[in-house]
Amino acid sequence: FFSALKTSGIRKDHQLIVYDGMGLFSSPRVWWLFKLMGHDKVAVLDGGLPKWIDEGRPITDRAEPGETFVGKPYLQNHLIADFDKVFVSVREQNFEIIDARSVGRFNGKEPEPRSGLRCGHIPGSRNIPFRKVLNEDNTLRDSCQIEEIFRSAEIDLRKPLITTCGSGVTAAVLNLALSRIGYNNHSLYDGSWAEWGGRLSAPVAVGAD
């Protein structure tokens, strides 16, 4: 990621706005990556390119040439969780783990799209499919709605949170939603189910709990 920045023309003092072609899907992951690298001046375009086009706003097919990036990343380790951190948290129950995958994949009743992965979820984790925090037009729900979604899932917001999904992409949608409600004690399990489900040493739960 940092290697790509070197020819991007992005500077540390730039205010960044990231977007994707699906509304809110991969852009929160990019937002999180910039945060992880210590670039705080980054926001997500709500609704992405589809909403921008629907509103009749200007678009172009030209890309501005980039300049050499000057600077270095300052990794914000509190924003990322690795396998060991999640493994310990399952035993000690000192984090809330939230899974952004679909209900069927979480319960282990739908096959995983990646071959060789077990079905189910991390024991003790809760399920909030990422689309639940989005409106029909793929914009982020308002703060009150998001808070109610997390409360309905019995998430204890007094604990630090770890988000997870299939590969670490849509989990970032939940991180973005948490930031919208002013809750900042959250990290993202980068390996997500692609790592957890592929490790035979990792415990797996099936069903709704």
Give the location of each predicted region:
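Helix-loop module immediately N-terminal to the HCX5R catalytic loop
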Residues: 1-15, 128-161
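Thiolate-centered catalytic microenvironments shared by cysteine-dependent enzyme domains
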Residues: 1-89, 170-187, 191-192
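Conserved beta-strand elements of the Class I
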Residues: 17, 96-98, 162
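Active-site neighborhoods of enzymes that stabilize oxyanions during catalysis
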Residues: 49-122, 200-209
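Short, flexible loop segments at boundaries between secondary-structure elements
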Residues: 126-135, 193-194, 198-199
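Short cysteine clusters
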Residues: 165
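Cysteine-dependent PTP/DSP-like catalytic domain, specifically the C-terminal lobe
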Residues: 184-209
